[in-house]
Structure formats: C-alpha cells, structure tokens
C-alpha cells in the first residue's frame, strides 16, 4: 500500500501535485451527478410501473442495502486511499489484477461513445424546441399537398419526427446508410461541451458541476408542480404506485431491481475511483457512500412522481381523445347535431344505437377506450423521452417552454454522467503517464475527446440506433457486473479484509461495522455471481432486435429481426473485450515475472533463488511491508 | 299546368341532388366546434351564402362563367349540419362533372372557409381533399441558428481555457522560488516508487544529484 499510516502525506503536493477538489460539495456533487443520470428518469419509472408499482421499492431497497452501497463504499475507499485512477489502484493492489483497471477504462471508453450520442440526440431535440409550433406537432404534407406523408400518417407525428427526421433510420441493421450531418454536428457539439468541461480535469469539472448537477433538480421540481396540477395526474400516480405484491414472486423482479441499482449508481466504471482519488485521504468515505446512494435513490423516486403524473395526464388525454373520436364517428354517421353526445352519455347512446342499428354501428371504426389500457402503455429509454414525452408536451399549454426545460434537464443529466465516464478514462491515463510529462493536460483530454468523437461517428449512420442498442445491451451489462464482482473479490480476498478495514479506520476514524464486513465478504460476491449467471442465460436466447420498417404489415409496430452473423459476433466481442483484459494482464504480468526471474538467475548463478520468492506480489508492489 | 311544371322541376331536382348521386358531394360543417359560443345557426340564408360561394367558385372555371346561384342544388340538410349538393349546367338537366367541381372548390377553399369563419377541419367536403398549407420553412432552420450561436460560444470558451492554461504554466515556470519553500515539508513524502522522494527539483533543470540536494536543503534552510 502506498501510504502507510504516517502524518499527512497529502500535505506535500508539488510539481507532481494531484489536483484537489475545491471543497467537499464539489466532490459530492460530482459523484451524485455521475450517479444520477438518464436512467433515473427513464428507466426507474418504467421498472416501477412494470413490476407492480410501489411493490418494486422493496426489492430495490434490499438490493441497495446489500449490494449497491457496499460496492460503492469499496470503490470510494480504494480510490481515496490509493489516490490513483482505476489502473493505478488495481496495479497497487496486485499487479495480477491490473487487468481490472484496464477493463474499467475500456468499458468506460465504450460506454462514453454511445452515451454521448444519446446526449447529442437530446441536444438536437433541445435545439428544435426553440420554435412554435414544435416540429413534431404535425406531419409534413406529402408532395401533392393533398395529405400527410404516408409514414407519418401510419404512425404518428412524434414517431415520424424521431425515426425519420432525426435518425432517418433504415429498416435493417445491414443497411448502414449514410452519415446524417445534423446528428454529426450535434455529436461534435456534445463532445466539445464535454471537452470544455473536463479540459483541466476536476479543476474545470468542479466549477461546472454546480450547474449541471443542480439544474435537473430544479427542473424536476418545476415539472412535479406542473405535473400535479394537470388533469388526470392523480389517477396516474394512484394507478402506478399502487403496490401489486403478487409480482414479487417473479424472480425477474428481484434480478431487475438488483441490476438497476447497480447501473444507477454507475459502479465499476472507475469514475468513482477517479473522483475519490482527488480527495484528501482523511475523508469519511463511508458517510459519502451512504449519502450519495440515498440521494440517488431519492432522485429516482422524485423523478418517478413527476414522470407518473405527466404519464397520468397523457393517459387521461388519450382516453378522452379516444372517446371523442368515437363520438365524432357516431355523430357523423348518424347526422346527430354537433356535441350532442357528451363523454358520459356515450356508453348509453352506443348501446341504444347498437340495439337499433347494429349493422351500421359495426361498420364504424369504433375503438374500445379504457383508461387502464392507456395507463398500462409504458415506455422506457429513448422511447419515453423522444416519443411519449414529446407527445404529452404538445398537449400542455406553452409546449416549447416545457420541451426546452425537459431536454435541458436531460442534457445536463447526461453531461454530468459523461464527466464521470470521461474522467474514468483520463485519470488512469494521466497516472500511467501515457504521454510525456511536457504534454499539457489539455492536450491529453483533447486527444481523448477527439478519439471518442471520431469513434462515435458510427452512431450517426442511419443504422446507428441499432448499434447503440447493441452497445447498451452487450457492452454495458455483462462487463459491469463481472468487473464489479472482480473488484469486490479483489479487495476482500486479494488485498485482504483486515488491511482494508485498517485503511478505512485510518481514513474515517472508525472501523467498518459488521454490516459492511458481512456484505463485502459474502453477500455482494454471491449476488453478483447470480447476476452474471443470469446475464449469461440471457445470451442463450437468439439475439433479436426491433426494426422500424415502414413496409412492415403491422407497421407502426416494430418488426422483430434476428441479428446477422457479423452483428452477433460484434455483440460477443463487445461483451468480452473489457473483461478479457483481466486474464491478459495477469498472463502478461506472470510472463514478465518469469522472464525477470530467469534473467536474474542467469546474472547471478550462485545465489539460490527460488522462483516463487519473486512471484509473490508483496515484495515488489507493496513497499509499506518494508515500512511497517 | 304550372303545378305540373313545378312538380316536374322539383322532381328533376330531386333526382339530380340525392345522397350518393352522380357528381354530388357531401358537405359537413362543425360550426359549434369551431366557434363555440359565437356559433351561428344554420338556416336558409346560410344555405344561400353557400350556394353563392359554390357558384362563385364555378364561375372562375373557364367555360363556366355563366353559373348562377340557382344552378347549385342542396338537399338532405341534417341537424349535424351536413348536406349534399350538386352543380347543374344552365339547362338544369345535367350535373357538372365532379372533377370540375372538385378542382373549382379546391382552388377557392380558402375563400369559402373564410366566408363561414371555418377552416379545413370544420368545413369538410368529403371526397374533396383540401390542399394543405405549405410547411413554414424559413430559409435557415431555426435550430441551425441556435446551434451556431452555442457552438461559437463553446469554441471561444475552449480557446480561452487553453490560453489561460498556457499563461498559468508560463507563470509557474517563471517562479521556481516558491517551489523551494515547500520542499521542507516534503521529507515524509513517499510515493509508490520504492520510497524515493518525488522530484520537485526537476524544475530547476540541469543535472543534479537529487539525493544529495535533498540533504543539502534540509541542512541549510536559507
């Protein structure tokens, strides 16, 4: 371990000085901003809705307590103690485990590619919100101007704007299409903003984070107030939060809760390690871990209330429109006076007409309108933001303002997560010293951002969205779980529980309680093994994706297609690549040791050196064993 | 005799204007939806205006300048408000082809709408699709303008940050004396690299035996 218990090694920061946070608030806000991301807005409410409303909170809290907070604490503690980015930290713990750090860096790189593309999409919508009427409010007319464009007519104006005018998506992943220039410049702008904010590391990030971390809360509050005053909001809230306890018997619920808490806290990216490494060593990271995890949790709940009240409004709106359309059909066909059937009278009138003119009524395009059906329509991910919310927004008075606020909030949320992700890549590179010392930090960050931007241009192709889904499903999930598992096992069993508790006692002033020790030792690795198994099981199913194909018979439903062979190969590669670093690095380390042993043995043939002595990691990389 | 003629005429008219008749169009108005409280009642005077507007539209068609209001026949007016109409030729025996009527109405739809304070959704000619208003396309889309502004701000900010970083570094390089004072505190500093103190002395440049220098500094605080 680098710093044995000695008076204040942190006081000496010189030419090599490690940057520091200006104050504790910056550090907390950065970690919170990194943890709180787009998933809190569009993933958690969806899960809550699908898995029995209020009942979902039970597995969620259990997962938080037994899995999320312990692993989070481990990351903050090792970052703060070892004062290095993820590569340095793992190399210090054990050179054989340096692959974990490399894996984290690779993973953060891959995730930053597609995450910033989503931020670019949000930026595009934000820029388009500055007009009235909003561009997604109506379909464009077709060439003769006799009707609307067919694709738009078949789906909806918002879907058309998203799939055609934004993504210009192809019907198949094989068909790459061309680069969409508007997405490319939005992507360039997003990476420019990220570069501007991380240009000097936490020096610049720390200033910007005040805005990017706090602005979303402001907007959420505004939306909450607005949402609760909309008609139908309370219906949405009641329906969506009503607990359905039976659903807890489904094991999927528990697994999804656990994976959600995991991604929600942004664990195993290496970002928290990087942020914590800029702390002073004597910082209570235990309290920080608990506080940030709870804040993240509360944000998810807070966001859910806002989202559900808006969804309730949307469902009520759709329900009323459905009724109105039916009433209009009846009035038009039977030539009743206008507005003669109110919404309440409709069922009675329909029954009466059905009795007297059954054939005529049967010919009419009447749809069954049930409020529950509309409330059940759930959406998550980009679908929630870019399709469902934009449609709801059109019905709210002052639509452009709400659209601007919403997309502004999503932009800042995505941005603060990007800071952590990019920092997870830059800090280890800085520590390892990839570029010579005289190259300024600005150049390194610029290079990283440029490389990321150029790599991410593949997502601006017409098939980009399909690739993004591949990255999201296959690069992120399995690797994060496996790396986190290795993190916990590495710290607890390789580094040693006793030494780790001693370090924490030195940093925070008290030893970790039995809760921490138990969760680290037993519960977290166990849980993680289960999840890894689950993810592997997921892969056994044939890999499918949903394509947007206007020529599909069931359009606007999305067509399910199988991934072609090369795409499947890409999926497998993405899910293995970051984790492959672990065995590769361990092997490389082993070979280097062996070679050194042989070389030393050849240089000093008289000394009786057992090969094992040198392969023990302690002697080389843990100088404090000499110090103690 | 006159009665006979009257009945004959009405009979012929009745034949010409019937729901679903050849060259007949159904019209549907939603006055209350459009105007709410200010809705007017649909009476024969409104019908007269309607006939006048249709006749006006037909008169704009070449060869049909002689169309009169009496050539336009309405029938089956319901409470909805909806009715059928046909346009007859001067002999009042035949109806004008639907295609002509359709194109005439399409060209003047705006005038007809305005006469009744309605729009394309509330005054519907079933079977005559209305020409949609061209999309409002400003020469430069708004989003590009805003994008340009934001991007310029970002580029300027980046340039300023880079420049300020360069100035800061230049200033630091010109002030090595401050660095010396801090060295005293650094004795206990231990890095991961095998316990050799980190090297702030690099700033002084030149080839210096670092270990020796450290000792020296410690002993000569001046």
Swiss-Prot record, chain A:
Transmembrane segments: 27-47, 52-74, 89-111, 179-201, 208-230, 254-276, 289-311, 400-422, 443-465, 475-497, 518-540, 569-591
Topology of the protein relative to the lipid bilayer: Multi-pass membrane protein
Tissues showing expression: Abundantly expressed in kidney, but not in intestine.
Residues with glycosylation annotation: 144, 168, 174, 354
GO annotations of cellular component type: apical plasma membrane; brush border membrane; plasma membrane
Localization, UniProt: Membrane
Stretches in topological domain Cytoplasmic: 1-26, 75-88, 202-207, 277-288, 423-442, 498-517, 592-628
Residue numbers on the Extracellular membrane side: 48-51, 112-178, 231-253, 312-399, 466-474, 541-568
GO biological process: amino acid transport; neurotransmitter transport; neutral amino acid transport; renal amino acid absorption; sodium ion transmembrane transport
Domain of life: Eukaryota
Keywords associated with the record: Amino-acid transport, Glycoprotein, Membrane, Neurotransmitter transport, Symport, Transmembrane, Transmembrane helix, Transport
UniProt region (Disordered), positions on chain: 602-628
Disease: Genetic variations in SLC6A18 might contribute to the disease phentotype in some individuals with iminoglycinuria or hyperglycinuria, that carry variants in SLC36A2, SLC6A19 or SLC6A20.
Family statement: Belongs to the sodium:neurotransmitter symporter (SNF) (TC 2.A.22) family. SLC6A18 subfamily.
Role, per record: Does not show neutral amino acid transporter activity.
PANTHER family reported for this sequence: INACTIVE SODIUM-DEPENDENT NEUTRAL AMINO ACID TRANSPORTER B(0)AT3, SODIUM/CHLORIDE DEPENDENT TRANSPORTER
Name under which the protein is recorded: Inactive sodium-dependent neutral amino acid transporter B(0)AT3
Organism the protein comes from: Homo sapiens (Human)
Curated annotation (Swiss-Prot), chain B:
PROSITE patterns per record: COLLECTRIN_LIKE
Tissue: Kidney; collecting ducts. Pancreas; beta cells of islets.
Subcellular locations according to the entry: Cell membrane
Membrane topology: Single-pass type I membrane protein
One Pfam short name: Collectrin
In-chain residues carrying the UniProt-annotated modification Phosphothreonine: 214, 220
Keyword Cell inner membrane in record: no
Signal peptide: 1-14
Residue intervals of the Collectrin-like domain: 21-222
GO biological process assignments: calcium-ion regulated exocytosis; insulin secretion involved in cellular response to glucose stimulus; positive regulation of amino acid transport; positive regulation of L-proline import across plasma membrane; SNARE complex assembly
An annotated Gene Ontology molecular function: protein homodimerization activity
Any Gene Ontology CC annotation: extracellular exosome
Site location (Cleavage by BACE2): 125-126
Residue intervals passing through the bilayer: 142-162
Glycosylation sites: 76, 93
Topology feature Extracellular, residues: 15-141
Keyword terms, alphabetized: Cell membrane, Glycoprotein, Membrane, Phosphoprotein, Signal, Transmembrane, Transmembrane helix
Effect the entry attributes to changing residue 152 to A: Does not affect dimerization. Does not affect cell membrane localization. Abolishes dimerization
Oligomer and partners: Monomer. Homodimer; dimerization prevents CLTRN cleavage by BACE2. Interacts with SLC6A18; this interaction regulates the trafficking of SLC6A18 to the cell membrane and its amino acid transporter activity. Interacts with SLC6A19; this interaction regulates the trafficking of SLC6A19 to the cell membrane and its amino acid transporter activity. Interacts with SNAPIN.
PANTHER family linked: COLLECTRIN (PTHR46884:SF1)
Family: Belongs to the CLTRN family.
Domain topic, free-text comment: The cleavage site containing the double Phe-Phe motif acts as negative regulator of shedding by BACE2.
Known disease link: An interstitial deletion on chromosome Xp22.2 encompassing CLTRN and a deletion spanning CLTRN exons 1 to 3 have been found in two individuals with a neuropsychiatric disorder characterized by autistic features, anxiety, depression, compulsions, motor tics, and neutral aminoaciduria. Plasma amino acids were normal in both patients.
Function: Plays an important role in amino acid transport by acting as binding partner of amino acid transporters SLC6A18 and SLC6A19, regulating their trafficking on the cell surface and their amino acid transporter activity. May also play a role in trafficking of amino acid transporters SLC3A1 and SLC7A9 to the renal cortical cell membrane. Regulator of SNARE complex function. Stimulator of beta cell replication.
Entry protein name: Collectrin
Organism field: Homo sapiens
High-level lineage: Eukaryota, Metazoa, Chordata, Craniata, Vertebrata
């Amino acid at each position: 371990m680098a710093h044995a218990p000695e008076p204040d090694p942190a006081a000496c920061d010189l030419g090599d000085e490690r940057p520091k946070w200006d104050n504790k608030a910056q550090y907390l806000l950065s970690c919170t901003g990194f943890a709180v991301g787009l998933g809190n807005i569009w993933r958690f409410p969806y899960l809550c809705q699908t898995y029995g409303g209020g009942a979902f909170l039970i597995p969620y809290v259990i997962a938080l307590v037994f899995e999320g907070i312990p692993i989070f604490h481990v990351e903050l503690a090792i970052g703060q103690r070892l004062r290095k980015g993820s590569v340095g930290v793992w190399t210090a713990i054990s050179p054989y485990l340096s692959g974990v750090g490399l894996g984290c860096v690779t993973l953060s790189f891959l995730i930053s590619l597609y995450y910033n593309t989503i931020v670019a999409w949000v930026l595009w919508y934000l820029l388009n919100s500055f007009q009235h009427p909003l561009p997604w409010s109506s379909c464009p007319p077709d060439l003769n101007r006799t009707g609307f464009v067919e694709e738009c007519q078949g789906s909806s104006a918002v879907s058309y704007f998203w799939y055609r005018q934004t993504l210009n998506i192809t019907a198949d992943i094989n068909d790459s299409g061309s680069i969409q220039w508007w997405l490319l410049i939005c992507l360039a702008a997003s990476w420019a903003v990220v570069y501007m904010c991380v240009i000097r590391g936490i020096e610049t990030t720390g200033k910007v984070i005040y805005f990017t971390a706090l602005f979303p809360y402001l907007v959420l509050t505004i939306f909450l107030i607005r949402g609760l005053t909309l008609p139908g909001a309370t219906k949405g809230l009641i329906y969506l939060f009503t607990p359905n306890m039976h659903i807890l018997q489904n094991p999927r619920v528990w697994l999804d809760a656990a994976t959600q808490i995991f991604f929600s806290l942004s664990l195993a990216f290496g970002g928290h390690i990087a942020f914590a490494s800029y702390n002073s060593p004597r910082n209570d990271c235990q309290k920080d871990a608990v506080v940030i995890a709870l804040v993240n949790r509360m944000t998810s709940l807070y966001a859910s209330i806002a989202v559900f009240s808006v969804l309730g409004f949307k469902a009520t709106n759709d329900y009323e429109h459905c009724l109105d359309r039916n009433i209009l059909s009846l009035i038009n066909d039977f030539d009743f006076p206008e507005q003669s059937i109110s919404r309440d009278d409709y069922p009675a009138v329909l029954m009466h007409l059905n009795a007297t003119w059954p054939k005529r009524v049967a010919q009419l395009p009447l749809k069954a309108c049930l409020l529950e059906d509309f409330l059940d329509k759930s959406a998550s991910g980009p679908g929630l933001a870019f399709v469902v919310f934009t449609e709801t927004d059109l019905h709210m008075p002052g639509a452009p303002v709400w659209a601007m606020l919403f997309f502004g909030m999503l932009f800042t949320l995505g941005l603060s997560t990007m800071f952590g992700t990019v920092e997870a890549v830059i800090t280890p590179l800085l520590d390892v010293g990839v570029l010579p010392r005289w190259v300024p930090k600005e150049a390194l960050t610029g290079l990283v951002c440029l490389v990321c931007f150029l790599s991410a241009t593949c997502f601006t192709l017409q098939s980009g969205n399909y690739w993004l889904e591949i990255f999201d499903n296959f690069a992120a999930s399995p690797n994060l779980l496996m790396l986190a598992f290795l993190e916990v096992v590495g710290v607890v069993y390789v580094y040693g529980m006793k030494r780790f508790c001693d370090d924490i006692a030195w940093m925070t002033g008290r030893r970790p309680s039995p809760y921490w020790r138990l969760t680290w030792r037993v519960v977290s690795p166990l849980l993680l093994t289960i999840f890894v198994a689950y993810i592997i099981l997921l892969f056994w199913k044939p890999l499918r994706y949903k394509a947007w194909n206007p020529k599909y018979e069931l359009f606007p439903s999305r067509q399910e297609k199988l991934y072609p062979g090369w795409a499947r190969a890409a999926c497998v590669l993405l899910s293995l690549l970051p984790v492959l670093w672990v065995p590769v690095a361990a092997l490389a380390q082993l070979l280097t040791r062996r070679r050194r042993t042989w070389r030393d043995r050849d240089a000093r043939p008289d000394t009786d050196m057992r090969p094992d002595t040198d392969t023990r990691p302690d002697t080389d990389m843990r100088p404090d064993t000499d110090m103690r | 005799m006159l009665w006979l003629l009257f009945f004959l005429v009405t009979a012929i008219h009745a034949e010409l204007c019937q729901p679903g008749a050849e060259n007949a169009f159904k019209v549907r108005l939603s006055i209350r939806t459009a105007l709410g409280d200010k809705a007017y009642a649909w009476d024969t005077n409104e019908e007269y205006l309607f006939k006048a507007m249709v006749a006006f539209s037909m008169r704009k068609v070449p060869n049909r300048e002689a169309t009169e209001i009496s050539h336009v026949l309405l029938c089956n007016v319901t409470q909805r408000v909806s009715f059928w109409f046909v346009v007859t030729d001067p002999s009042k025996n035949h109806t004008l082809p639907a295609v002509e009527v359709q194109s005439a109405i399409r060209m003047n739809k705006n005038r007809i709408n305005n006469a009744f304070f309605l729009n394309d959704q509330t005054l519907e000619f079933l079977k005559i699709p209305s020409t949609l208003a061209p999309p409002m396309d400003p020469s430069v889309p708004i989003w590009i303008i805003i994008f340009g502004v934001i991007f310029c701000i970002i580029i300027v900010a980046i340039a300023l940050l880079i420049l300020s970083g360069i100035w800061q570094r230049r200033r630091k390089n010109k002030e090595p004396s401050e660095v010396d004072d801090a060295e005293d505190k650094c004795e206990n500093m231990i890095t991961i690299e095998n316990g050799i103190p980190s090297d702030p002395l690099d700033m002084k440049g030149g080839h210096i035996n670092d270990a020796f220098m450290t000792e020296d500094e410690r002993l000569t605080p001046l």
